[in-house]
Amino acid sequence: MVCLECIFYLSGILIKRFPCFSIRNSGVFILKEKNLPQFFEEYLKKGSVFKEKRVLQANHFPNDIPHRAVQIHQVRVVVAPALRLERPSNLFIYGKTGTGKTLVVKWVINGELVSAAKKAGVSIQTLYVNCKLDADTEYGLFTELATQVGKELPLTGLSTDDVCSAFFSKADSTKSILIIILDEIDYLMKKAGDDFLYKITRKNEELKNTQVAIIGISNDLMFAEHLDPRVKSSLSEEKLLFPPYNAIELQDILNNRASSAFKHSSLEPGVVEKCAAYAAREHGDARRALDLLRVAGELTDRKGATSVAVADVDSAEEKIDHDTVAELVTTQPRQAQLVLYSILNISHGAGKFIFTGEVYELYKKYCAKASLRPLTQRRVSDILSEFDMLGIITARVISKGRYGRTREIMLAPQAATPVVRRLLEEALNL
């Protein structure tokens, strides 16, 4: 690869010449201080459009949740029996990313229900696990649950069943209702199967003091359709769908946060509307809308302006798309990167439909070139489903008559860029 030499002056800091050996290390600069403390002093003297930026973060707990009154009520109805020490029904919540699922569950369970239980003198325990971040295996799940109820485990020597038993033994030590919230439960099921659900429901029947209810949160609307019949039977779960927000609802959410996040008159007309329109276009994602508004404000601060303009929203969208896709591409397993590289080379850009069979044939050729054993076509199909969920591709199943069904795939515009191609080629050494 050709080495690039760059030199920039940024606010008194000399960024010296450096070779760009690869995309992965091109962000590592050799810095020479001119007057580094002065840079930060000047930064602190500069104004900001923000009053309280953390209000725009996805993990912020607001005072109100607009346009989710129906869903809040339905969750309340399901969990209310816990206040009488009666086991609530298991509940599976579905909806695309950024539709308020986790926020509503935490609002009702960790907020309202726990407060009501304290007033009533009732013992309700709540455990929250993000299955994608904290427990993507059955062993990891029960270890995390055991840790949260205060059970100390040895570092080695325990099987999954041992850890499961240790967790339930500790949880059953007091008379209470235990509500286990499993966020991104579909991610754990894809990696570990659904046996953990069966274990929880069967163990529940053996407990003497504690009764356990499961609340599963999923971005995949169809994941429960693949549950084993015995698991479905033991769960007897209720279901709740969170629909995407529309542009008007997203504007209300943004205005609700912006009044606390930004200084007076620091948002120009049309900024909130533009953020809402962009996010509504992408399945009504409130998290995306909040990120757009936050990044637009950050870009405004960096250029020293006093108000966020509509053009800053366009710049924010471009930055977020680039950063998100780059992270997704570089953190994928090698086999998944080969699948994506195959899609990229067949598609020749966004806007063209291709088929699973085409992708698989080219993928096998790249595996041979990389000295890797190819995955089965079914596993590659699972990877395509993950790409679809991540927004890297859009996919739909179509019928080809007597030839059966196949999947029609289109590469998302933000993934069909020279940067993505370069990242993949460097990661795969192609």
Regions found by a protein language model. Name each.
Residues 6, 18, 23-87:
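A short, basic N-terminal segment
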Residues 32-48, 88, 123-125, 133-253, ...:
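Mid-core helix/loop region of P-loop NTP-binding domains shared across ATPases and GTPases
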Residues 87-107:
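Walker A/P-loop nucleotide-binding motif
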Residues 111-121, 152:
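Post-Walker A helix-loop "phosphate-sensing" segment adjacent to the P-loop in P-loop NTPases
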Residues 351-430:
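Terminal-proximal interaction/regulatory segments of ATP-powered molecular machines
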